[in-house]
Amino acid sequence: MPKATLVSPPFVDAHFHLDATLSLGTPRLNRSGTLIEGIALWGELKPLLTHEAVLERALRYCDLAVSQGLLAIRSHVDICDDRLLAVEALLEVKRKVAPYLHLELVAFPQDGYFRSPTAATNLERALDRGVEVVGGIPHFERTMADGAASVRALCEIAAARGLRVDLHCDETDDPLSRHIETLVCEAQRLGLNGRVAGSHLTSMHSMDNYYVSKLLPLMAEAGVAAIPNPLINIVLQGRHDTYPKRRGMTRVPELRGAGIPVAFGQDCCMDPWYSLGSADMLDVAHMALHVGQLTSREAMRFCYDAITVNPARIMGLEHYGLDVGCHADLVVLQAKDPIEAIRLRATRLFVVRRGEVIAETPERVAALSIEGRPPKVDPAAYAPRES
């Protein structure tokens, strides 16, 4: 065992798309790198999906996730397929991985709740079959008015069923895309406080500062959480810019300063939208730290919380953490502390679920053959004295 180790609660990903994961190149690659081409590609892929293929890819991804210490995932699943093929496949995945990974599913109308003719019916069917969170994509509706109406309808469904809400909200560079304010209003109106999240919120990056100063207190009052997806936001946003080119990720320091719960999601891994990814939430935090300029020691520790305790709270995970009485779920990392874990994207030495080691990785130590220098290099040994 290395001298520098950190015992951490497991990583939690509050925003992912398990139905599309590991499908890179099928039926073709995203040449433009844009969100819109990614959605079009997914539309081409959907008719080709089989239950077995979705199941196999999702289970392979869960294997990778566990090896990285990622033991809880909230995955959106597209319901704009009348077969509900991906829904059925991921419900089976949920049952299969339950002994070692918590999987929560969001009914996601990828093609628009109103824009897709059967989305409303399919969403209810998915919820009836056991999908437990209501999703949406208001900025993809045909008009701003339809987008706002979809937010109201989806929140009413969640309130009637006693479910949580997690909408893809304002994933655009358009500063006038303000569906988050409708989401906040509906959370207050329907008593959904603490059960609602807005994912992405990239338009906030471009909004007028005065408007944001009004919006943030309303989000805090309604208990609406924010789930940026740093790896994807920095890649997909700003595609219509020349220079200067916007970073796209929402205003994380300001959200945090307003007392709004913030968690970072990975969103994609080797799929129509993103050709990279490795199920490594430390990679997500590392990108968020850079894009959001979250470089104070306190802010870097917050970035670690945004991939552990914060998403666990947003998802309502019970018995999560290292306190007495919690599940014995933990990760042992080859790092001195959370900041070093992010800096190094530290090796996950042991992953423990309910007290049993379910994954382990040898410590990362390089052997040197340089005269007069030490024979081995442990990257974790380079930590500053105070971090």
Model-derived features with residue positions:
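Alpha-helical scaffold segments that flank or form the walls of functional sites
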Residues: L6-V7, L24-H76, L84-K96, T121-D128
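Active-site microenvironment of metallo-dependent hydrolases
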Residues: R301-S387
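Active-site-proximal loop/turn and secondary-structure-junction residues that shape catalytic pockets
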Residues: I79-D81, P109-Y113, F140-R142, E171-P175, ...
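Active-site mouth loops of central-metabolism enzymes
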Residues: L41-E56, V106-T118, P138-A145
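Di-metal (Zn2+ and/or Mg2+/Mn2+) metal-binding site signature of metallo-dependent hydrolases
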Residues: T5-P27, T172-D173
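His/Asp/Glu-enriched, well-ordered alpha-helical/loop segment
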Residues: R164, C185-V196, N229-L236, R246-L333, ...
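Histidine/acidic residue-rich metal-binding segments in metalloenzymes
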Residues: L85-P99, S116-A225, D241-F264, Y320
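Active-site gating loops and adjacent loop-to-helix segments of metal-dependent hydrolytic enzymes
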Residues: T21-V54, G130-V133, H179-A197, A220-A225, ...
